[in-house]
Structures are given as structure tokens and as C-alpha cells.
Amino acid sequence: GEPVTVLQYWGHGSPGTVWLAGNPIPTAEWLSLKPLLIPESLVWLRICSAFQGRVGQVFAKQMADGLGCTIGAHTYIIGLFQGGLHTMKPNSMPSWDAAEGTEVKWRPDFQPWLPHSILCLQWWIPKGW
């Protein structure tokens, strides 16, 4: 079959973790998707805080290197506006500050001025993010 070029997962997250039905999805489960992807693929985790903190940066690197494609996710709690959107390519290092998203415990989702924010209806990641 055809490779998957874009995979978006909408759900719940926390730093370095993707959740499904109240349970974390192990990184190894995500890495099992590699045969379906190509280097030009994008796996976009539209969940809260997955790339937040050092643990989020380690997760981003594991996912990008392990899947061999670009990974996108957020450093902030998201809602209508989705802030802290960053991407990570294989064999690279995180380009965002590990403290991004950690300075406040809770923020309403209506904050389009947060770094790297998009509206939830946007289906592409701006170039360079």
C-alpha cells in the first residue's frame, strides 16, 4: 500500500507522554509504525504538552530518530489555540527551550500570543517550526 504521509493524533498528553483511555501509549508502540512511514512523513501529536521540559525533548528525539520522519507536538496545554508547536527531524536536536510551557501550571486555551500558536482548525505546520 501507499505510505502514510501525515498522521495526526488528537487526544491527551503530558510531558513526554501520549495518553489513550487513561493509559500512556509506550514510545515502542509508536515506533512500530515505522514501516508505514517515509522520511517525508509527518507525525503530528495534537495533544497537550508532549514536547514540554527535558522529558518532552527526549521524547521528541526518540520519536523522530526512531520513526525516521518529522514529529510535531506542543509544549503548552492546547485547546482552541494550540501553542508551543514545534517539529523535530531525525538526527537533530530540539530547537526550543525546555522551560517553554512550564512557567504556568494552567492557562486558558484562548491565548493566541503564546509562542508558535495556531488555531485548532489549521491543518499544516508553518515552515521552520
What are these regions (language model features)?
Residues 6-83:
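Catalytic cores of nucleophile-dependent amide-cleaving enzymes
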Residues 73-129:
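Caspase-like cysteine protease fold
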